[in-house]
Structures are given as C-alpha cells and as structure tokens.
Design a protein with these regions (language model features):
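Short, glycine/charge-rich beta-strand/loop segments that flank catalytic centers
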Residues: 129-134, 171-175
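Short linear functional motifs in flexible/disordered or boundary regions
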Residues: 25, 136, 149, 162, ...
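Signature for HUH/AEP ssDNA processing cores
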Residues: 2-133, 140-156
C-alpha cells in the first residue's frame, strides 16, 4: 500500500513543526547505534575519492546543508525517511518547546505536567516516544518566542507540579527541546 501525501498534509506539518529551514536532520542507524545528523548535499564521487585518501565525512569540506523542502517533508510523512528539526532559530527563538520524559513513571509525570499546563491555559500535547518507554509533551506558540523565556516558564511549571527539582535525580523529566 502506497501512502498518498497531499499538499494540505505538508502545509499542516509546516504550520506546527516550525524550525530552521536552511537545515534539517536525518535519522541514521549503523552497527546497532542510531542518532540524527544534518542532511547534506554532496557529490558522492568526490566523497568516495576523499574517503580513499583517508578522509572522513566529518572532515569532507565539499558539502552543504540541505534545506527542508516540501519534498523532504513528504518523504517523512510517507515513512520513507525520519526527519528531525532544528527548533532553535538564528535569533534564539523557537515556535515550540518539548519536554522529554523517560524512566518508569514517565506517564504519571507527563499527566501531572499536562494538568499544570491546563491549569494555566497552556495547550499541551503528549506524544509517546519512539522506544515506547517515554513521552514528549509539546507546547506550540503562535509566534516565535525567546527560547530562554519558554524554558524558564516550562521549568517553573515542572517544579510547581512536583515533576522536577534540581535536587531530585529520580525524576523522569530528562530535558527540554530547544
């Protein structure tokens, strides 16, 4: 079965998941490890020559960041590739903030955080992580907002609902993006 991704699906994605447009990340897996790295344009023939001379992709100079295009988003929505955004814009603002939760009690702590957001009329959305052993709580902004301010607000909410404390090392709260 082939998935159809229409223009309005791509526009919906772009209306929510806004980040840097000049670069995006692609997920990789190799030898049991995985992660994300920037997507690049490069000449594979020149890279192969560079590699034969002892070079690595990291020190290969003839590469440029690949911009996040509608085509790349379409491939992501079809499941052909996994795209990651760089949410922190050049001016240190972002269109969203995400709280990452892991460990055994992640769901309980996510629910506490969601209730705190609701108490302050902050729309927040829970997503289960790829592993299934954690969650991400997404908060979207109507306009790009200074990242340091959004982080302060979210940390204060996490502390208020008892999910995070600088002294508590057992919290399932892991980090914020950006």
């Amino acid at each position: 079965m082939r998935l159809m991704v229409e223009a309005h699906h791509i526009e919906l994605f772009k209306s929510l998941f806004k980040g840097r447009e000049d670069v995006f990340a692609l997920r990789w897996e190799k030898n049991g490890k995985s992660g994300y790295m920037p997507a690049y344009f490069y000449d594979p023939y020149r890279f192969r020559q560079h590699k034969m001379n002892g070079g690595t992709f990291q020190n290969f100079a003839d590469k440029k960041y690949k911009a996040l295009s509608d085509q790349e988003i379409g491939r992501h929505l079809k499941g052909e590739q996994l795209v990651g955004l760089y949410p922190l814009l050049i001016n240190n603002t972002s269109w969203f903030v995400v709280a990452d939760f892991d460990k055994n009690d992640w769901l309980e702590q996510c629910v506490k955080f969601l209730k705190a957001c609701e108490e302050y009329f902050i729309p927040a959305y829970l997503e289960r992580s790829r592993s299934g052993n954690g969650g991400h709580v997404w908060i979207f902004f109507e306009e790009a907002y200074p990242a340091y301010k959004s982080r302060r607000i979210i940390i204060a909410l996490l502390e208020k609902c008892g999910v995070f404390s600088v002294f508590d090392k057992s919290s399932s709260f892991d980090r914020l993006f950006p």
